Amino acid sequence: MLKKLFHSALWGLAAAGVILFAVPRLNNSNIFTSDDIISFKNAVRIASPAVVNVYNRSFSSASINDNDQLQVNNLGSGVIMSKDGYILTNKHLIQNADQIVVALQNGNIFEASLVGSDDLTDLAVLKIRADNLSTIPQNSARQAHVGDVVLAIGNPYNLGQSVSQGIISAIGRNAVGDSVGRQNFIQTDASINRGNSGGALINSAGELVGISTLSIGKTANEIAEGLNFAIPIDIANDVLRKIMRDGRVIRGYFGVQSDISSSSEEGIVITDVSPNSPAAKSGIQVGDVILKLNNQEGISAREMMQIIANTKPNSKVLVTILRLGKILQIPVVIEEFPVN
């Protein structure tokens, strides 16, 4: 028995010697070259100069006339959207601020003015007096997809600019947290902590994908992990343009709701009509199926919402519906979306 064991051990040692001779010694060599390292440093290098720190400062109640007593009430991030100083951030960050301070990554500090804000998307537009600022490239032809690698850039807990990495977990999320369902959120597992809000969500090419907004975190009974959300850049750009033009976002209002799961191939099934809304005033009913808006057919409920939102108040829209087997055309006068 011992002799067999001895021979087995010898064979094992011999085999090990052959393997060690044939395979390079891993402990003394790096099997990866520098070209093999997966890195997003170029994306970060492109985008990070355009991500700023945003500070909400307010007077303390004891010394309202003493500038030295301005205290930071809230902090977050922002994204420079134009070379002449327009910045997107979150509205909740600058709510009730006596002073808004923006710190660039090159160390320059500016007092910012509030151009306007939007409750429905929790976005705000700031302006600083500066020129030739860095911006993040955008690519409207590139669609965001579930599984895309994304990077969140911001100032978590005022530690300084930081980058977290994840993927797009879902797109088209609505009614998240306390939101009112118009954001069409991008969901990601890239960390968005306190201070990241208002910062940039970019793809691996360094292109702006969205504006980081919120994270679902600790509750009384559980901890949510990897549930972070951003406003898609197309919606953010639309809000930016409207606020720069009008100082606020003016949306059209129709006053219907549709459950996507109950919509048919023919059209959009109306599941609720708000009282005193334009839809109610024109006779739209629950159960009606919207086939067309003006001459546009085959649209989704989300597309309908966007079309109505971009329709000027007091404009007339011709709605083609299917009701109990009959096709009807109903004119609807669009009103301004009620903010409250």
Swiss-Prot record:
One of its GO terms (biological process) is cellular response to misfolded protein. The active site is at H92 (charge relay system), D122 (charge relay system), S197 (charge relay system). GO terms for cellular component: plasma membrane. It is an enzyme of class 3 (hydrolase). Gene3D superfamilies: 2.30.42.10, Trypsin-like serine proteases. It is found in: Cell inner membrane. It is a single-pass membrane protein. The chain crosses the membrane at residues 5-24. Its EC number is 3.4.21.107. SUPFAM superfamilies: PDZ domain-like, Trypsin-like serine proteases. PANTHER family: PEPTIDASE S12, PROTEASE DO-LIKE 8, CHLOROPLASTIC. Homotrimer. Belongs to the peptidase S1C family. A site-1 protease (S1P) that cleaves the peptide bond between 'Val-148' and 'Ser-149' in RseA. Part of a regulated intramembrane proteolysis (RIP) cascade. When heat shock or other environmental stresses disrupt protein folding in the periplasm, DegS senses the accumulation of unassembled outer membrane porins (OMP) and then initiates RseA (anti sigma-E factor) degradation by cleaving its periplasmic domain, making it a substrate for subsequent cleavage by RseP. This is Serine endoprotease DegS.
